[in-house]
Amino acid sequence: PWFGTWGRDTFMALPGLTLTTGDMVTSLKVIDSMVSRMKHGLFPNTAIKGTPAFNSSDAPLWFIRALQQYEKYDPDFDIWKKYGKAIKEVLEAYRAGTSGIIRMLDNGLIYAEDVNYPLTWMDAVVDGQLVTPRPGLVVEVNALWYNAVCQALKWAEKRDRTFFKSWSHFPELIRQSFVDQFWNQEKGYLADFAHGEFKDFSVRPSQVIAVSVEYSPLDPEMKKSILDVVQGELLTPRGLRSLSPKNEAYKGIYEGNQEKRDRAYHQGTVWPWLLEHYAEGVLVVHKNAGLGQVRKIFDEFEDVMSQRGIGSISEIYDGNPPHVARGSISQATGVAALLRINEMIEGFN
């Protein structure tokens, strides 16, 4: 085992690992444990030499999504009563700015930049340099931000009028700003990040999160177009590629020494955890008509579960066929994704 406890991954994996198996008690225990470690609206993402590193721009937003998922399994549970204070602390921290690294702009979007640390899941570093720098406005961070604000307002509407009045005008501002910043009508998909006047339109997978979230800033046609692009360039039987093979920076094989592997980690390598959001997006857009594709995605993993980590799936796979298994023999987010996809299928059945 390696990596240890990761704040972002904890909240990403929690619904799949606990809620789909009916383990509501563990789900809340983990959430409570993480909330006890929250500082200035942020969660520790890792511990570097024993010191917590609060260097995740989205872990608090995944926290709110985890609560959102929990409520679906226990609709009588009073989320706002127990976690309203923590939720407000998160949103106010983003709004006011956290240590000058993460802050809300006048257009309602979240801007995050730190030259010393990666702030998103694409976090490989070689010789002190980020392999996949994503400074400024990041697509999944702002999709999760919109979802978090909308969900918080729903919880607070009849419980916390002061908070509701203070935040009620933000969803439309954020939604319009998101579309203005990230959507390209001609290309038919979203920018991965925007920094100043520059927008990175490399075809990357994080945009599917903007399709899958409960509250999405996108209209149905945008969602369908994004899924078409992702299916055409990123979808494999093992997950979504982290970069399109059409991009000159694409690396289709994850091999070599530590440096070579790190340079390929988010530059074409396939990640199974992203399938949760792709599958959810397919069912959101196509409903029953998409069930066959989602079932195929799930069934594709049956054979590989008897390889490497028995009864599990690998952390990553090569971007190039035959998509050789790489990385850890099992990782929480990938396993959680398959559990959630299985439940999506059963839900439609």
Where on the chain are the PLM-derived regions?
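Aromatic-rich carbohydrate-recognition surfaces in CAZymes
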Residues: 4-10, 14-120, 138-142, 146, ...
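Noncatalytic linker/hinge segments flanking ATPase motor cores
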Residues: 57, 248-257, 342-344
